[in-house]
């Protein structure tokens, strides 16, 4: 991917939006933050802290409710850590003090409502439960998994809305869930396309995927500098 065209200059980080001061914008921005971070937080509580599913679900919801009400995440200082690390550390502190906090949780109010697919997260988690991975590495892996899943969902909506169903099928067959032996040639034969068409169709979907993934990443970082580092690490691109 070349140049800066994939990095919308108008998209502010979720932290900038939360700090903006407008109550409606803060609530909307916090909802975006929850969408990006709830799954890594939930899985971290399940795997690192060994919380049972139901307790981890309650703790995840309560953590974000408390963070919203107490403005914990607004205290982030970018020179000390990456924002995702700060979120994880805040979750750790919350769990350590969860017994004292439980009486103050789930007050509702203006906390943004986000649908959390705990069952889906649990299915993704199952193979991980036999060992306890290094916390930061595991949290990062799940952050990336959630980021990519959101980008794929947006791509599906975009391509289905424009009738590019074959593009999606190729993307799913080659990139999302490839079978042994799959190749551009086998897909071309199966779908009645040329190899060049398969190449071009996949390029379109991948370009859209990276655009949406990078846009989402920009929103979930704590600063422009952090975003540039994360984009370089994940996609090998320079956003300068």
PLM regions: where:
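Intrinsic, short, N-terminal disordered tails of RNA polymerase sigma-factor systems
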Residues: 1-240
């Amino acid at each position: 991917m070349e140049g800066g065209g994939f990095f919308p200059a108008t998209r502010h980080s979720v932290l900038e939006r939360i700090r903006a001061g407008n109550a409606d914008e803060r609530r909307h921005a916090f909802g975006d933050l929850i969408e990006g971070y709830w799954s890594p937080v939930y899985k971290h509580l399940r795997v690192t802290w060994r919380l049972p599913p139901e307790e981890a679900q309650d703790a995840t919801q309560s953590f974000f409710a408390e963070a919203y009400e107490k403005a914990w995440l607004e205290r982030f200082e970018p020179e000390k850590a990456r924002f995702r690390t700060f979120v994880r550390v805040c979750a750790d502190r919350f769990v350590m003090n969860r017994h004292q906090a439980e009486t103050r949780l789930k007050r509702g109010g203006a906390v943004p409502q986000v649908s959390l697919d705990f069952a889906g997260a649990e299915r993704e988690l199952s193979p991980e439960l036999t060992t306890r991975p290094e916390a930061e590495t595991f949290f990062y892996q799940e952050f990336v998994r959630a980021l990519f899943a959101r980008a794929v969902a947006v791509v599906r909506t975009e391509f289905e809305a424009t009738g590019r169903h074959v593009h999606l099928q190729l993307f799913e067959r080659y990139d999302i869930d490839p079978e042994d032996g799959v190749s551009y040639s086998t897909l071309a034969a199966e779908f009645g396309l040329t190899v060049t068409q398969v190449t071009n169709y996949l390029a379109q979907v991948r370009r859209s995927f990276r655009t949406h993934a990078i846009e989402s990443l920009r929103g979930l970082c704590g600063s422009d500098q952090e975003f540039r580092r994360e984009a370089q690490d994940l996609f090998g691109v320079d956003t300068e």
